[in-house]
Amino acid sequence: MAEQDVENELLDYDEDEEPQVPQESTPAPPKKDVKGSYVSIHSSGFRDFLLKPELLRAIVDCGFEHPSEVQHECIPQAILGMDVLCQAKSGMGKTAVFVLATLQQIEPINGQVSVLVMCHTRELAFQISKEYERFSKYMPSVKVSVFFGGLSIKKDEDVLKKNCPHVVVGTPGRILALVRSRSLNLRNVKHFVLDECDKMLEQLDMRRDVQEIFRLTPHEKQCMMFSATLSKEIRPVCRKFMQDPMEVFVDDETKLTLHGLQQYYVKLKDSEKNRKLFDLLDVLEFNQVVIFVKSVQRCMALAQLLVEQNFPAIAIHRGMAQEERLSRYQQFKDFQRRILVATNLFGRGMDIERVNIVFNYDMPEDSDTYLHRVARAGRFGTKGLAVTFVSDENDAKILNDVQDRFEVNVAELPEEIDISTYIEQSR
C-alpha cells in the first residue's frame, strides 16, 4: 500500500459511522502550545492538581514530591479530558502524566475497558502496567491487565472473559488479535494513549494496526500521545488522531541534552573493548550499570565474561522467551543484579531508577537510539554517566551526528572523573 493511501486512512470518522451520544462534560480549555526548558523540581506539588486522595497517597508512597515540568504542564489539562500531544526528554516522567490523568478520570464499570494504552515493545507495555499498579494501589476496584505477543493468547482471552480489566496496556499486534477474536471489546474506551508514539506511527504495518484499533473505539474519547523524539514530519500524523490537542514540546528537539548526564567517548579497537570495560567497572562508582551491545551473540558472550570476572551481570535480549526476559528485567529492577547487558530491545522507555552509568559497548545505529540508550542514566534530573566506545570510522560519524543534532560536546574520557559529577552524594 502506498504511503499516500496510508495517510488517507488516517482521516477522521464519518459522522454517521457511529451513533453520537450526548455527553455531559467540562468544556475543553483553550488550546495551549507550550515550549520551555526543563527544570528538575517545580515549585508546586502534586496536591495542586486536586487529584483523588487515593492517588495522592500512592504518589507519596512512590516518593514523588514535586512534578516535573512535563507533569506540571500536562496534568491539569489532561485530567479535564483534553487531547495531549507531548514530546519531552527521556526521564521526565511522561508515563506518570497519562497514568495519573486516566486514573483520576476513571469510573470503573464491571466488564468495560475504559483505558487503552499501547506502546511498541513488550517490555515497555509490562513496565507501564506496573506503573498503573503502583498508582492504583489504593483504588482496589480498578483492574489492570497487560497483553503482548510471545505469551499464550489463550491466557489473555481467559482474563478478558473471567476478569475483564478497566485498564488495558499492550502492543498493537496482540491488542488487534484479541479484538479480532472478539475477546476484547473497545466500544467503551474513554481514554486512548500511545506511548513512544513515533515508533508506532513511523512503521507502516504498526501504524495500520493502530489505525484499525483506533477506529474500533468511540468517536468521543480522550487521545494522548507521548514520545521523547517527535519529528516535525510525524507530528501532523499524530494530530490526525486528535481533536484540537494541547501540544507540549519541552525543549527543542535539536537540544535533547540531559541535565546532569556526563557524556564521554573512548577510542579503541574492537578487540580492546573487554579489557577497557573491565578496567572502568573496577574504578567507577556505580549503583547499577546498563551495557548496550549490537547483537544477541555479543550480549550473551559479554554477560558470561562479566560473570566469570566476578561482576554481578545479567543479560536481556530478543532471543529469550518472554517470561525469561520479564523475570530478568524484574531481577535487575529489584537490585538483585547490578549490571545489565542488553540489546536495543531494552533501550527505549525502560525506567530503572538506580542506573547511573550506561556504556555503549557497541555504537548505536543512529542519534535517536543514542539518546534513548544514554537516557537510562540520569533519569528525573539526577546525575549519570554515559561512555561510548568508538572503534571505527562509522562509529565516529554517528558520534559526530549525535553532537551536531543535540548540540552537545561528547569529550574523550579523561584519566580520572570526579565522582560527584556522575553520582548523587548522600547528604
Curated annotation (Swiss-Prot):
Sites of the Glycyl lysine isopeptide (Lys-Gly) (interchain with G-Cter in SUMO2) crosslink: 31, 35, 154, 162, 240, 255
Domain of life of the native organism: Eukaryota
Enzyme Commission number(s) of this protein: 3.6.4.13
GO MF terms, alphabetically ordered: ATP binding; ATP hydrolysis activity; identical protein binding; mRNA binding; RNA binding; RNA helicase activity
Keyword Nucleus annotated: yes
Annotated region (Disordered), positions in chain: 1-35
Modified residues (Phosphothreonine): 171
Motif (DECD box): 195-198
Binding site for ATP: 88-95
Short sequence motif named Q motif, residue ranges: 44-72
Enzyme class: hydrolase
Biased composition regions of type Acidic residues, renumbered to the chain: 1-19
Domain Helicase ATP-binding: 75-248
Domain Helicase C-terminal: 260-421
Reactions the enzyme catalyzes: ATP + H2O = ADP + phosphate + H(+)
Localization per record: Nucleus; Cytoplasm
UniProt function note: Helicase that plays an essential role in mRNA export and is involved in multiple steps in RNA metabolism including alternative splicing. Regulates nuclear mRNA export to the cytoplasm through association with ECD. Also involved in spliceosomal uridine-rich small nuclear RNA (U snRNA) export by stimulating the RNA binding of adapter PHAX. Plays a role in the negative regulation of type I IFN production by increasing the nuclear retention of antiviral transcripts and thus reducing their protein expression.
Family note: Belongs to the DEAD box helicase family. DECD subfamily.
PANTHER family, sorted: ATP-DEPENDENT RNA HELICASE DBP3
Record's subunit section: Binds ALYREF/THOC4 and DDX39B/BAT1. Interacts with the apo-AREX complex component SARNP. Interacts with MX1. Interacts with MCM3AP isoform GANP. Interacts with ECD. Interacts with PHAX; this interaction stimulates PHAX RNA binding activity.
The protein's name: ATP-dependent RNA helicase DDX39A
Organism: Rattus norvegicus (Rat)
